[in-house]
Amino acid sequence: MRLPNLLATSRGRLTAFFFLYVTEGIPLGFAAIAVATQLRRQDVGPAAIGAFVGSFYLPWAFKWAFGPFIDVFASERLGRRRGWIIVTQVLMAMTLLSTVLLKLPEQLALFTAVLLVHNTFGAMQDVAIDALAVNTLAEHERGLANGLMFAGAAIGQALGGSGVLFLSGVTGFQPTFFFVAGSILAVTLFVALPMREATPTARARAEGPSRWQVASAQMRHFAVEAFRSFLGTRGAFVGLAFALLPSGAMCLGLALQSNLAVELGLDDDQVALLNLWSSVISAGFMVLGGYLSDRYGRRRTLAVYIAAMSLPVLYLMALLQQYGWVMPVPQGGANPVVAPSALVLALWIATLAYAVAQGLMYGTRSAIFMDVTNPAVAATQFTAYMALLNLGIAYSATWQGIAIEAIGYPKTMLIDALFGLVCLLLLPWLRAVRGNVPDGGAPRRARASAAVLGLACIAWLPYRLHSGALGAAAPIFETVFTVVFVASALFLLAGGAVLERAPRAWVRAATWMALLLLALYARRWMDLLSPPLADGAALAVLVLPPAAGVLLLALAAQGWRELAAVDTQPAAAARAGAVAQ
């Protein structure tokens, strides 16, 4: 029996993209819910679990880098997007199945590395699916299709999280890996393989630059346009900071919640049911949040939603403090601690109430970024905003795990609830101006950004030399510096591409320094190296950030005339239009 090409009909296209997005949600639910729960049950500490969950989101923060390669390196026989979807889905299944024989928690580092590769393929698949949607969906189908795609992702997370936990009670945990891989491959077999893309016009390949050169040029173009758009207006620049900050308290949506669920005595079925209900509630309130924001104003409603996210966290924090449930409770002992029933009930109430507030927030936040996006580069700028949101999730999961072990649950939750409100200070400046055209302030913002990042990188040296004095707080500072290094790397990559008049040596140095800064994320695994290599790596880790800081301060002294040249004409035109009116 020949399966139908779902792309051939309107109903088929909607069905196809729903199921394709299911495969995007499965890995996230599997890691953040199912694996995190099982690791805590095996007495893996919250810090290790937080680092595991945080690393899982990193590929999504850099998914914009995959776009040029997916555009350029394509198979006309398999389909330009279909080929990438099929290949990445197969690789997702293969990488997951390769972990079946790993022993947890003994081989957690290797397990994390393999799942990081697994989720990289997931992020690549996301880019290919979105590109296919843009090319195949009719304009009147896009609204419903987007709703179905988000619903598919939510169901995928429930399948990979709650579904795996339900199943593990019958089969054990490791066999559920076959279920997850099989779910992905089922979509490959019944949806992706039968699809047929429209045949594109044949592309000449005899002359001209190589595909690698074309892809590199496209990536450079993306970086330059994103850099200029972020710095072009005050609203867009503030939006960059807003994207990097957590939008409200985050702990009840990350590993802290599953850690507590295990410690309070919930079995796998109960944890699965808790996460299933929270997913359903959050999905429903996403729609309501968007509707209310259109009616009562985005900034006003978003402020209420973000503030509301802290209330369940503070409620649960107070109950934990009241009952003396402060530090993580070891698991697997002969005499397990029995939690008061009031705390179990409080966890349910707080988690479901948090799902309401989080759903309302998600339904509104994206529209805020649309408000400050320059229409001329909308796809580039909005994609970059969405990618950076994943960086906030990654570092939040990491620091919270460290803090739980250092200062306990209540204080970690208090910090999270308060830190989640910081973004509210930026909301008044997240306001669109006429046309969102550049206002002439980009050079000034570029210099200020380079100076701040440069000083932060230089601060790494005294921190590293005296980190022992910080005690249990040192790992949290490590997380802060990781964010600084990633932000500095992105600035160097994009800024080096913009500064066309700068010496070529500077541009090359910026590129290589950016790559080395990104590589510093691997410093947590230096202990796995042999002693001579570990000593060399330790020296490199010590001196690279200050060297990057010096380079950034040098960039802060530049005039950034390239940005001024781009700004001048649109800004003048906007002012002239305003005067004419």
Model-derived segments and spans:
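C-terminal ends and interior cores of transmembrane alpha-helices
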Residues: I85-P105, A307-P340, P428, R524
